[in-house]
């Protein structure tokens, strides 16, 4: 059987296409009609150009078969059926290898600077709910400001995030990175792991660390009784504030930091504690909502200003407008029915790669705008996956 493989070297070594071609294929060569790298790059191309579902991807490729043959330098014009994409993603792709390749590829993109924030967070793939009672649950390490996933693993559920998080972070280069997660991840051992790997952490103190939360809260309470012989000792508080308008409300965030508890609180590498007040006013009703949270960080006062710390925390809380929104709404991840758990995980990983490619090109105002452009210019989409 004549296989639909490439007949010439048309790739830059560091391109996404080259990375996909490097993945191992467990199928025997006899009877293998389509290479794994070819299938994956066709999925990525179709997604760049606006397709989300496997049937739509297959039709998009079929209608552009002559273009695909020319660009990919294939031997034959016949393109895969949508069931072929599903079968290969569910049965042939090695998820761990695909995740590692994705990590290596995205880490090579120019997203990084000093003290870049890496967030850890879990997500249910609702499109896989038929595959299991709770659907596929993924734990990701990602860049909130970009919505880019660096590493993602499947876990049993939210309760499995704590043991899985160290494994995810171990696969990353944490030097010059600042790791943040929700209160579930405020754990001593992961704090040690992060700092020993050259990174820093920002944690929220809530119900799972009640004593830490109470100690920090009391520190920021106004002094009501003098200390015998000392009166009211001075505190080293520094404050930053930002006000933003949008989504029908005015929101003011006020962050106050202190370094004076670092020698009193029993937490590894703790340098500063903080209080964050959020006050929002509804433009329509005038309703006022206030929230106060407490946390701590391993970052020194000289390494980060209160305003910079405030913005990092806000960046983390922007996940719904970053990673989750882009994948759920723009790439329709939660609306794409996938009755096999492994298929859902593979598609999520490819979505991460698509977002990484699109976000590495800053000339597009939004992800939908970029996809509309590539829909009209598929040859440019091919350049994106085949060139550095």
Would you name each region that the model predicts?
Residues 206-314:
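An anionic, glycine-rich sequence signature occurring as long contiguous blocks
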Residues 42, 57, 81, 85, ...:
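Short, conserved catalytic/metal-binding motifs centered on acidic residues
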Residues 36, 311-388:
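Basic, amphipathic alpha-helical segments enriched in Lys/Arg and hydrophobic/aromatic residues
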Residues 107-180, 186-199:
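Polybasic low-complexity intrinsically disordered regions
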Residues 1-119, 128, 140-152, 166, ...:
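Dynamic "connector" segments at or just before major functional cores
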Residues 170, 199, 221, 225, ...:
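Generic secondary-structure signature for well-ordered alpha-helical cores
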Residues 21, 196, 288-293, 304-306, ...:
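Short acidic (Asp/Glu) and glycine-rich catalytic loops that position anionic groups and cofactors
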């Amino acid at each position: 059987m004549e296989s639909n493989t490439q007949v010439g070297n048309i790739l830059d070594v560091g391109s996404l296409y080259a990375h996909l071609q490097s993945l191992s294929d467990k199928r025997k060569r006899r009877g293998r009609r389509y290479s794994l790298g070819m299938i994956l790059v066709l999925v990525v191309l179709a997604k760049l150009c606006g397709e989300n579902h496997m049937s739509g991807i297959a039709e998009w490729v079929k209608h552009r078969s002559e273009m695909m043959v020319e660009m990919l330098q294939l031997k034959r014009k016949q393109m895969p059926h949508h069931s072929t994409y599903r079968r290969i993603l569910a049965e042939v792709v090695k998820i761990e290898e695909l995740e590692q390749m994705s990590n290596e590829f995205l880490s090579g993109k120019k997203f990084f600077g000093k003290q870049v924030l890496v967030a850890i967070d879990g997500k249910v793939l609702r499109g896989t709910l038929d595959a299991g009672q709770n659907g596929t649950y993924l734990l990701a390490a990602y860049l909130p400001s970009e919505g880019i996933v660096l590493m993602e693993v499947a876990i049993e559920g939210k309760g499995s995030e704590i043991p899985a998080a160290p494994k995810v972070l171990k696969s990353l280069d944490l030097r010059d990175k600042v790791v943040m997660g929700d209160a579930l991840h405020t754990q001593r051992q992961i704090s040690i792991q992060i700092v020993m790997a050259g990174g820093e952490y920002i944690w929220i103190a809530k119900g799972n660390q009640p004593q830490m939360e109470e100690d920090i809260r009391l520190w920021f309470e106004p002094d009501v009784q003098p200390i015998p012989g000392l009166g009211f000792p001075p505190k080293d508080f520094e404050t930053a504030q930002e006000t933003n308008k949008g989504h029908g409300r005015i929101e003011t965030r006020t962050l106050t930091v202190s370094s004076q508890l670092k020698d009193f609180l029993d937490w590894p590498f703790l340098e500063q504690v903080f209080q964050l007040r959020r006050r929002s006013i509804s433009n329509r009703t005038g309703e006022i909502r206030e929230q106060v949270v407490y946390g701590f960080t391993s970052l020194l006062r000289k390494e980060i200003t209160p305003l910079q710390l405030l913005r990092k925390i806000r960046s983390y809380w922007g996940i719904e407008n970053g990673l989750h929104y882009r994948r759920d709404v723009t790439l329709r991840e939660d609306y794409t029915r996938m009755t096999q758990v492994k298929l859902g995980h593979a598609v999520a990983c490819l979505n991460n790669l698509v977002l990484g490619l699109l976000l590495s090109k800053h000339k597009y105002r939004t992800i939908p705008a970029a996809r509309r452009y590539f829909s009209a210019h598929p040859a440019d989409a091919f350049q994106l996956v085949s060139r550095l």
